[in-house]
């Protein structure tokens, strides 16, 4: 069959990798590179070159089994990294890094701060109580994180300086949106990733040489069928197949795989079905401004508080997530220069220290979106169309691979 695949992120490339075995595929990519959120940038400092990841960075040995199996098939090497999380609040001056006891009290005054100790106690209480509530079915499907925190009487320091900014950093969502986040979804993710345990946590990893190292081997078997700078403009379907309108004109296909974002897929459909409107319309995305730079002022004031992920508080709770990734820690970069990737903080960065600007869209989760996710199978096959993407689950690389495998199963293909 002739199959059009729209999008070349992890979902699109995995779909193409599998479907290319027996079918005639064409991958349409609007950008001038393939990989989607996997975008490694080469920079040079003091005569040395470094490959810095600006989108997809980390994965772990607990919750990425299919992605790791794919890397194994491709012969792509990876190495362990350190995952740690810090919060800094310019208003109160509070900052900490949860990596160790020493870094937790990087700001030594926290040792004698009752509010800080209340936060620590509530971290331990939340980790214990929320798992017990989940296991004993005491979390209603309609309950949000904010409702649970209020009902449980958790202190404001725990809410505002720990659990909500951590969620905002993970899903690139505003603090307000995190308060409205579906609690069951939140707790299952935190439990599965060891985030509700002090000691029992997965080993996080990065791909050696940068995340983009898997792109060439993954696409090698079909690279001649990839069209860069070729955005799809409209998709029409009829009883016999699919018409794809792109900058190349009109082309006819038997099937189409939408491996782009949910909102993009819905916008491309000339005549979306009621199910497509309802399901895809509930799966929202939001843009995040991303800057690669060397301005360490966006990290905590005390170097001991520098973590892999660093959340900066301040401003209204509705503003987009403000997180900075310390790439030297994450990628094990040996350099006197500290490379940072910051979300939604462009105005605070010294312009002369900016190495690159990018924009990535991330799924925005809600009670409606979780309900829509459960209906994925309804959009696999009808009208010769298949939809895949990380938005069908937690929004990460493993989820993109799993969604592509669901599509591939309909064509009798598997990893």
Where does each model-flagged region fall?
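N-terminal Rossmann-like FAD-binding beta1-loop-alpha1 element of flavoenzymes
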Residues: 2-27
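Conserved Rossmann-like nucleotide-cofactor binding loop
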Residues: 11, 33, 263
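Glycine-rich FAD pyrophosphate-binding loop
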Residues: 20-44
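N-terminal glycine-rich dinucleotide-binding loop that anchors FAD/FMN and/or NAD(P) in oxidoreductases
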Residues: 41-67
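Conserved flavin/dinucleotide-binding core of flavoenzymes
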Residues: 42, 99-100, 318-415
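Mobile amphipathic helical/loop "lid" adjacent to a hydrophobic cofactor/ligand pocket
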Residues: 61-180
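Helical element adjacent to the flavin cofactor pocket in flavoenzyme catalytic cores
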Residues: 188-246
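Mid-domain catalytic core of redox enzymes
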Residues: 231-361
């Amino acid at each position: 069959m002739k199959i059009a695949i729209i999008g070349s992120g992890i979902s699109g490339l995995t779909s193409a990798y599998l479907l290319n075995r027996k079918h005639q595929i064409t991958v349409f990519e609007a950008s001038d590179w393939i990989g989607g959120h996997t975008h490694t940038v080469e920079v040079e400092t003091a005569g040395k070159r470094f490959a810095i990841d600006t989108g997809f960075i980390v994965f772990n040995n607990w919750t990425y089994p299919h992605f790791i199996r794919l890397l194994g098939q491709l012969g792509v090497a990876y190495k362990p990294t350190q995952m740690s999380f810090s919060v800094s609040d310019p208003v109160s001056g509070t900052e900490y890094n949860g990596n160790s006891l020493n870094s937790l009290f990087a700001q030594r005054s926290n040792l004698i701060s009752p509010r800080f100790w209340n936060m620590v106690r509530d971290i331990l209480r939340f980790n214990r109580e929320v798992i017990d509530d989940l296991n004993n079915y005491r979390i209603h499907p309609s309950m949000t994180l904010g409702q649970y925190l209020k009902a449980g009487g958790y202190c404001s320091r725990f809410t505002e300086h720990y659990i909500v900014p951590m969620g905002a950093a993970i899903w690139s969502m505003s603090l307000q949106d995190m308060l409205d986040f579906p609690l069951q979804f939140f707790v299952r993710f935190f439990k599965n990733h060891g985030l509700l345990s002090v000691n029992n946590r997965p080993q996080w990893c990065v791909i050696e040489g940068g995340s983009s190292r898997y792109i060439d081997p993954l696409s090698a078997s079909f690279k001649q069928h990839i069209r860069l700078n070729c955005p799809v403009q409209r998709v029409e379907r009829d009883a016999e197949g699919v018409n794809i309108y792109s900058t190349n004109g009109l082309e006819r296909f038997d099937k189409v795989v939408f491996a782009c974002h949910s909102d993009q897929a819905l916008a491309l459909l000339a005549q979306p079905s009621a199910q497509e409107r309802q399901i895809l319309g509930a799966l929202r995305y939001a843009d995040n401004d991303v800057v690669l730079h060397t301005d360490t002022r966006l990290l905590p004031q005390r170097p001991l508080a520098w973590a892999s992920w660093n959340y900066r508080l301040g401003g209204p709770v509705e503003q987009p997530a403000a997180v900075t990734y310390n790439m030297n820690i994450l990628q094990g970069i040996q350099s006197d220069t500290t490379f940072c990737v910051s979300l939604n903080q462009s105005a605070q960065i010294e312009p002369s220290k900016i190495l690159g600007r990018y924009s990535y869209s991330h799924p925005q989760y809600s009670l409606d979106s979780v309900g829509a996710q459960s209906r994925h199978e309804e959009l696999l096959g009808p009208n010769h169309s298949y939809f895949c993407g990380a938005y069908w689950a937690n929004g990460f690389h493993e989820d993109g691979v799993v969604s592509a495998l669901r599509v591939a199963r309909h064509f009798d293909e598997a990893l």
